[in-house]
Amino acid sequence: DLQAAYQGDPAATSASEILLCYPGMTAVIYYRVAHALYELGARLPARLISDIAHSTTGIDIHPAATIGGYFFIDHGTGVVIGETAVIGERVRLYQAVTLGAKRFQEGEKGILVKGAPRHPIVEDDVVIYAGATILGRITIGKGSIIGGNVWLTHSVPAGSNVLQAQMRNTTVEPKHLIDAVYQPRI
């Protein structure tokens, strides 16, 4: 994670600077500790640690989320990563990115099902730019780029570029939405 931050930010001058001054790095360190505790069954301490990280950095990562290595959050403020999100290796997020739920699964008598998969899967080598909102149990394919301020509720295949301008003034039937909003990279 530290190496990803250093190599991913041209303004970074040293590992010490990143460890001491980058809220994204602070949030990821807290997440790694909280996630380990969560996996060991110490869920309340894990949630407390993630709450401290959120209060300190403005970045909200649920300790149950699964995040691969070499992960970098640049600028960070307002990033939200939900409980069942899965993030691959070498993923980079910018400020105000949300990996959230679109709807909640209900069981008997309308009671919400705890822990049901409802957050995105982000595959390896993906970059998600500032203000993007990605909702639901969808997949962002390997090597994709999600542009700033994109609102995305459908999966996109590997190598896609999804840009906010493609979303503007677009009226399509839901089954044709993916064709209207993504453009595979060549």
Q: Regions from the language model: what does each represent?
A:
Residues 54-170, 174:
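Structural signal for interior beta-strand "rungs" in well-ordered beta-sheet cores
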Residues 1-51, 175-186:
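Terminal amphipathic alpha-helical/low-complexity segments used for targeting or macromolecular assembly
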